[in-house]
Amino acid sequence: MFDKTITRWGTHSAKWDLLAADLGQDALSLSVADMEFATCPAVSRAITRACEPGIFGYTEVFDDFREAVRGWQARRHGWSPAVGDVHFFPRIVQCVSALCAIVLPGQFGRAPRVVTLDPAYGPIIEVVERAGCELRRIPLDLSEGRVVIPERHFAEAMRDADLLLWCNPHNPTGRVWTSEELDMVSTLALTYGVTVLSDDIHADFQRPGRNGYRPLAIHSQQLWESGRLIQCSSPGKTFNSAGLEASAIVVRGVLGERLEEAKRLMGLHNPNFF
């Protein structure tokens, strides 16, 4: 599956056809948000089976989706969230939008103060800025050949913040954060009452022999039980299936209910048939 050349020109590809429209078909896309090899055969077979009846009506999320999320997390990462804590969003960036534009402004009566590491995923930054948030970007230290969080600046930014946009493994550097770094994040979040959204969409890409990924929810049970930690995952990167738009948002209690209300307000219901 990794040695077959697939041409994506003319398929309405955001990666290739948008580039061609701007720069011509000789341009080479260096984006890595999706890839040029096919998804695994099991995924293709499942989609083919879903197509066979020939009816593509409105669909709904049931507990089999939530059970699938819990099962994957348990098998791969040793974490078994409660089924009732699993919520569906098409894309993680839409969950960020719901938080920044609806949920947190409703809670505080103002635009939230948001902390993120820099560099960060561009569409998420755009959503935060368009929501009128105060964005605090903490540049990562790359001076010694590895990615390091400047702890003093990070702690200062967290002091009166409302939301931390965390990413593990980090996008775009690929850094998997250590136990000590996760300790720092959870301690600061608990100390200052900061909500944490952990975008773990790349969690299933791990290189053998490197620092292993661990969900923040496992690392800090106290932060998870506080109801201020949102764990986000998706098969989109792992299986090169971003166009199917399916993400799992796992969060405890009232915050999950508020995200569901915000999702309805955004007109997000009846997910993609696939």
Regions found by a protein language model. Name each.
Residues 162, 193-195:
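The start of beta-strands in P-loop NTPase/AAA+ ATPase cores
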Residues 33-35, 168-172, 237:
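Short glycine-rich anion-binding loops that position phosphate/pyrophosphate groups of nucleotides
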Residues 200:
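Walker B catalytic acidic pair
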Residues 61, 228-274:
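PLP-dependent aminotransferase class I/II
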Residues 56-187, 203-224, 230:
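Conserved core of the PLP fold type I
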Residues 168, 196-197:
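Residue-level marker for buried hydrophobic side chains located in beta-strands
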Residues 2-94:
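N-terminal small-domain helix-loop-helix segment of the aminotransferase-like
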Residues 40, 44, 65-66, 182, ...:
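A general structural signal for well-ordered alpha-helical segments in protein cores
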